[in-house]
Amino acid sequence: MSFNTIIDWNSCTAKQQRQLLMRPAISASESITRTVNDILDSVKARGDDALREYSAKFDKTTVTALKVSAEEIAAASERLSDELKQAMAVAVKNIETFHTAQKLPPVDVETQPGVRCQQVTRPVASVGLYIPGGSAPLFSTVLMLATPARIAGCKKVVLCSPPPIADEILYAAQLCGVQDVFNVGGAQAIAALAFGTESVPKVDKIFGPGNAFVTEAKRQVSQRLDGAAIDMPAGPSEVLVIADSGATPDFVASDLLSQAEHGPDSQVILLTPDADMAHQVAEAVERQLAELPRAETARQALNASRLIVTKDLAQCVEISNQYGPEHLIIQTRNARELVDGITSAGSVFLGDWSPESAGDYASGTNHVLPTYGYTATCSSLGLADFQKRMTVQELSKVGFSALASTIETLAAAERLTAHKNAVTLRVNALKEQA
């Protein structure tokens, strides 16, 4: 089915509708799983020596110093244009503003007289950021990860990226307060962050995107007792656009293509109650596709993508919630009015002037988002991901005395005698003091 095929949702059977919303299959092959497991074990056992061997094998690079020096970072900064530095500064300012606003006030309540309960937040002590390499370095992800880590107060923030690390990544790391940067990529970088080596410190939590090997490595270390937590499950990038007859076809097409160019496994979907809009968007996609350097990648992604005509906007919202897109763009006359009906989406973009690119780079929201349907249970990355909540309780003698019989009754019902005794002993002590 080509992207030019216009699908009438209400002419499809329930089975066909489910198939239309299926994502491209993702699963790590047995060979990837085994290879990653071997890499993790090797790095854990052999440390820096294993990292250097894997860099030579996979990155075809001889790494003398794993840690990037301050001089190298300063030189990278000198090579960047002032225009790019200024653009990064604007983006960081907006990201700071939005994520600082996410700070939660402490909870401090008396649930009953003499029983005080609190909830306080503490930063995750150490975090590791993974940034992929390649021809198009994702320095914007450095901004999205390192900025909230700094605001949260994480004591140790380190970054790994495959050598040679792009100047943009090094400058972004410095700009956002990353303390150490390491010339390590792939699954071996995840292993180094999870277990620690002579050069790379072990961290409590790992953030960042990557290829199938990196994704599998993150999954595996998150399940090992001696490993590390991870940010969220990862999958191919995706966008769903809801548009009515008031939308601009060229705008819609550009948003669909900006997602499709990420990779051949990306998925884009258009939902519209207007068949003419669907046809106009399809034509605009073809026109714009011809001008893209990554046209072949985008075209492959479009093979698993959909143009769907619905009964009305309410049905568009219903289908979108069923799919739960990573990015949801609403280009309708009443875009803001539809938000209350949206229950599952990573990030929502309202109106003609809110392209996904704004959130990807500089509006202030985070571009690290749940994909592959995980929006049903996962949130977009935010300050809370770099923090942990801790509860505190304090009972006075009056509060304890009032609650004691309740606790004893509940503990006895669960046949946890020691729990009951911990209360009874204190009750008896109070009686003796009286």
Curated annotation (Swiss-Prot):
InterPro entries (UniProt xref): Ald_DH/histidinol_DH, Histidinol_DH_CS, Histidinol_DH_monofunct, Hstdl_DH
Keyword Protein biosynthesis: no
EC annotation from Swiss-Prot or TrEMBL: 1.1.1.23
Binding of substrate, residues: 237, 259, 262, 327, 360, 414, 419
Binding annotation for Zn(2+): 259, 262, 360, 419
Cofactor binding summary note: Binds 1 zinc ion per subunit.
Residues annotated as binding NAD(+): 130, 188, 211
UniProt cofactor(s): Zn(2+)
Annotated active site: 326-327
GO cellular component, one term: cytosol
Pathway assigned in UniProt: Amino-acid biosynthesis; L-histidine biosynthesis; L-histidine from 5-phospho-alpha-D-ribose 1-diphosphate: step 9/9
GO molecular function terms attached to this record: histidinol dehydrogenase activity; NAD binding; zinc ion binding
Family named by the database record: Belongs to the histidinol dehydrogenase family.
Biological function: Catalyzes the sequential NAD-dependent oxidations of L-histidinol to L-histidinaldehyde and then to L-histidine.
Name of the protein in its database record: Histidinol dehydrogenase
Protein species of origin: Escherichia coli O157:H7
Gene designation per UniProt: hisD
